[in-house]
Amino acid sequence: MKKSNKFFTRVFICTMMTFTAINAQDTDDSVPQSTFNFSGTIDTYFRSSFTEDPVAPGTSFANLNGFSLGMANFIVSYEGEKSGFVADVVFGPRGSDAVFGSVGNSSEMVNQLYAYYNIAEGVSITLGNFNTFLGYEVISPAANFNYSTSYMFSYGPFSHTGAKVDFSISEDVSLMIGVFNQTDQTEANYDRYTAFGAQLGLYGQYINLLAGDEYFQLDYTGGFDLSDSFFLGINATTATLAGDTGFAGIALYPQLTTSDSFAIGLRGEFFSETDGFGALVSEGDADNFSLTLTGSFTSGNFMFKPELRLDSASSEIFAISPTETSESLTSFVMAMIYTF
């Protein structure tokens, strides 16, 4: 795996140097149009599992009990004619969970920090820390239909620090290749291993690949507009680690828009792990099926999301009281999100 990583790194660097050399001969005397933007979100929620002990599914975010905080997310970005940057900071429990791989003091607030340069028409290079390209769901609650998250999202990568090149081949076809630190090592490379990533986009469907030291993940993310008001999102992934350890899953996201201000959606996810991966159990194999029904009411920049989630596992993994465990769990969440 080390030799493979070195090979991908060399190929990646040669590709960047080639495009940079080609573009160096192209000058543009026009005045650039530059813009600064400030945006972000805040979210808060109430959660109950209707059990004696506060217990939650083993997924990221929206897993605290009672009245709880999500995060405040502030993004400063600059977009010039040829270059730009994004500085994205987070505060609160959701933000802390999102950047758990940052061990330095101030870095625990940094969700994304990167600069990019358009080296040719339809070709850009990005260097820094950016959220992952794998999966259907994202860290920001405003961009997800469901407020709670899936197992596939929770145990895949959150962020990468490295360099990537994006190719916009046409309106419907895109390609990305990149070399990164190991997954979620956001500040620096602490173990000297690197990971290789790639994404192929075809007509709104995306095939994603991430390979590193004893890690390989293949992911499909996409969706289809079945009518003007009905959308079906799809995510499927498989990941293997050292030995036989790994996980796989598939989720469907049907969503129905009933008016300009209301939509209702369902997430049905089947997730399985092998050889004590740790999402469900510490030893052996296990699986979990979850159904999450979410309503989404929107008024301007404000969103209100009531949600009911049912989890059913292959073993008794939910501690519903000091003396009792269960294979199933019912959760209710009520969230408010504001974007700006």
Could you tell me what each predicted segment is?
Residues 1-27:
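Bacterial Sec-dependent N-terminal signal peptides
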Residues 58-64, 95-106, 212-340:
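Outer-membrane beta-barrel pore domains
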Residues 40, 44, 69-78, 112-117, ...:
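Residues on the lipid-exposed face of transmembrane beta-strands in outer-membrane beta-barrel proteins
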Residues 62-94, 252:
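Glycine- and aromatic-enriched membrane insertion/assembly motifs of diderm outer-membrane
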Residues 82-85, 122-125, 172-177, 202-207, ...:
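Repeated loop/turn-to-beta-strand initiation elements of outer-membrane beta-barrel proteins
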Residues 45, 50-66, 95-112, 120-201, ...:
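Surface-exposed coil loops of outer-membrane beta-barrel proteins
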Residues 8, 22-42, 47-58, 131, ...:
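Outer-membrane beta-barrel biogenesis signature
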Residues 40-48, 87-91, 127-129, 177-181, ...:
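Transmembrane beta-barrel strands of outer-membrane/channel proteins
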